[in-house]
Amino acid sequence: MDAQIENAIQIAWDPQSDPSLKSQAFEFLQQLRADPSAWHICSTLFTKSPRSADVVRLVSLEIVNLAVQVQQLDAASLAFLKDSLLDYVRRTYGPGAQDEPDVPSLQNKLTQTLTYLFARLYKSGWETFLSDFLALTASSEGNPRQRDNVRGVTLYLRILGSVHDEIADNMLARQGNEGKRNAELKDAIRERDMRMVVESWQDLLSQYTGRDDAILEHTLKVMAKWVSWIDISLVITQDMLNLLFPLIGCVNPQGGADMVRDAAIEAFTEIAGKKMKPVDKTELISFLNLRQIISELVASPPLSQFRGTHRYDSDLAESVAKLVNVVVTDVVKVLEDGSVGEESRAKAGQHLQDFLPLLLRLFSDEYDEVCSTVIPSLTDILTFLRKVPELPDSYREMLRPIMDAIVAKMRFDETSHWFEGEEAEEEADFLELRKRLQNLQKSVAAVDENLFIDVMSNLVATTLQNLDERGAQMDWRDIDLALHELLQFGELALPNQGLAAKSQPSSNAAERLNVIMRKLVESSIADFPHPAVLLQYMEVCVRYCVFFETNHSYIPRVLENFVRLVHYDLTRFRVRSWYLFHRFVKQLRAQVGNVAETIIQSIADLLPIKAEVSAEDGSEDDMSSDQTDNSADAIFNSQLYLFEAIGYISSTSATPVDKQALYARSVMEPLFRDMENHLEKAKSGDAQAILQIHHVIMALGTLAHGFGDHAKPGHQRQAPDKLVSAEFARAAEAILIALGQLNSRMDIRAACRSAFSKLLNVLGSAVLPQLPQWIEGLLSQSSSKDEMAMFLRLLDQVVYGFKTEISDVLNLLLTPLLQRVFGGLAEPINGTDDEIQLGELRREYLTFLQIILDNDLGAVLVSETNQGFFESIISSVVTLAKTGGHVNMVASRLAFCTLYRIVGVWGGPDVANISANPSAPTGTPTPAIPGFDQFMIERFHPVCFEVLQDPQFNPSKDAQSKQVLNEIAALEQAIYVKTGNSFISHLQSSLFPALGIDGTEFLRCMTTSTDKKTFGNYLQNLIKNRR
């Protein structure tokens, strides 16, 4: 059998094996893994001599591992495995071993197997596990602490590391009873073998220092693992510390990494971070002399003399930073603990004073990884200081060096070359670090606002002063830093933003900001020859537009700078600058005055559109995609900001209306010609021509948006001036011509739909006669349900905006419009996306009907033109109320709301009332449409109970179903109010007998529930009791 297994493994792992044989071999091995007796043969295959091939032995051990882990071997089987493997280990790794040691992969697998046996047998069955492997380390029984057998030492250390990983690694998720098992094993080790294990570390450190760095490093890494769960007093003896201290301080004479030193620091970090009582922690920090150790490390040549050179040891810096971070974090915990005595608190306070300079040295390290390592502890310090009610001077004095260090770290380092493509990832990492540093600055400001204001304002003022004196000779990094910090300063200076949102805005900060902004605008910073500075300048001006609202005289100068900077010959710069120019103009359009002609002339060279079809994005569905990179699409999307900005600046109150129309015409005429020149090619399917027309349509719409976007939130939309409206009516006509020719293209329809929505405010009622053309073009035979839904949403705006003027147009277009919509509603569903789009179309259709009814346009639905379609509308709403019941609750709720509105519009005067003490119904129903009273009872009422009795309708467990239930209750009551006794008679003759109730409680609840939810709860209980 063993030969068969060996052969199968070799075939399975031989790349040259016949595929059919290989498949059979894998199948055989799969069966072998499930065989409860296979482990016995496999253990022999591993230990036998002469040895089998490495792959055979590796797979054999895997099968043994599986048996120990999963198959729950009995005590005799485990004992056999223990004896056979221990015998093998002694032969291979013990003193005087003749056999060659296993290759590393087999040593790892053997260590894993032995660890699994440890977990099963250490408590009972192999109590001498650790001492058995420790015995392998000594060549002479007479001198057992002379650990001179390197093979045995290496395996012993592997075993210790593996045992920790199995029972004490907190990063691994534990299942079932593993946690309990691991706790018991750790307790057993502490009781039996812990002192022996620690002594073995001491022996190894003592005997291998200066002889074998690999063993030293391995020993230290094992110590670092075990320290977290053993009695720390066993480790921090003077003898052990005397061995550790020289290793921590050892220096590689060539500079660069020293693995032993780094491992020693890691072990020390774990010792320092050991969880213990606050009093003990302060004593431990003192006992370990951590301040002196870290100070010496920081002052050592790798971190001091070699700083700023290629010999600087960043790995050592990061290791020391981890140690400092652990120590400071624990010190802060002691200070935050209210139960700590004064003596311990004083010691902790002194520790904080001692370690802060070391922390700030590492925080300021040129390597951002080192800086990031200590950010958590610096955050802890600032969080603690925020909680101190009356900040002592000793603590307040810490803030200035902290703030200075943060500001210094905010600066681009000397190797940075902003905007160079190969450094994009490095720049992104730094900008992410800046965000973390900003949070630290905010914490400083929260502790001492005046300090924050002084540092920030002095930094900016000094930089601007240096700029005046040195001009272009200044380092761009210094100016960039000042401008970046100025952007952060606004969180204090401006109200309702950032820190100021929690309290009143800082008048001191606001005053400083005003002074700084004056200096900034008056300086020559906009002429500095570096894109980082120029773009930051634009960002600052846009960020503080509120400054220009009260300092109008500075606007022309800044606007002139912006117009110049939007021409900057760097794509990434341009893309951002066009957006910032748009923001600046938009926010200050009431103050810029009549400058449109000058600006249009100045940026005219940026307006020509050059559509580019990229090889990978040439399909029609991708033409409208919004990119965030420097692709042609992304550049065009930014170019649109220029058109919108022209719209804003051309339609200011200071610009005469005839001039507004002239400016609009001057920008649109080239676009019209461009569209006309490309239309024929586009009709023949030319991708570039189609994309060009798409872009022109988008530009026309965006320009219109700038002209029409004047209303502030909450203000009534004003009718546009006829001169301006006439110009944009020409744009609408041009777009409609293109749409009529190209409406089979989804991307063209999308651009036209976008333009239509933006033209509404500048066209005013002039859009109404064009509506049939828009509908014809935008709702083509190839329009998706999603497109129909979006267009209905636009029509909602039109109906609401022109409700007094739209009646005649709506009367003409309603039936053809809804026929298109019904076609979309009837389309079969193919996949999840289709189902989502159908749900959206249903919701928009029902909302559109409600908008018509809510704006007193219901007469259009029953006009002579549309009355033949009225029955179809009602049927569609009733159907959606039913089909939405459990598939689309939102549509169902809207459908019942629509039926409720229909009852209100055509149900006639009330003949009954709902009140706590209702009177009996009086008179007969007189609906607005003859016979509509019976129509409501026979068509609307049944759908209510059809949904209620649907087994999948469960309002007690689903919030959306509950909303539908409430709308059903409201509809039932509305029908009663309009039909009175007719409805009661219907209920008594049909519904109540069907439900098996006398109806008294039903009628009482329906007629007295002034809140529809009360009647809804009754209906819910009624149906629930019948299920």
From Swiss-Prot:
One of its GO terms (cellular component) is nuclear pore. Disulfide bonds: none annotated. GO terms for molecular function: small GTPase binding; tRNA binding. GO terms for biological process: tRNA processing; tRNA re-export from nucleus. It comes from the Eukaryota. It is found in: Nucleus; Cytoplasm. Belongs to the exportin family. tRNA nucleus export receptor which facilitates tRNA translocation across the nuclear pore complex. Involved in pre-tRNA splicing, probably by affecting the interaction of pre-tRNA with splicing endonuclease. This is Exportin-T. It comes from Pyricularia oryzae (strain 70-15 / ATCC MYA-4617 / FGSC 8958).
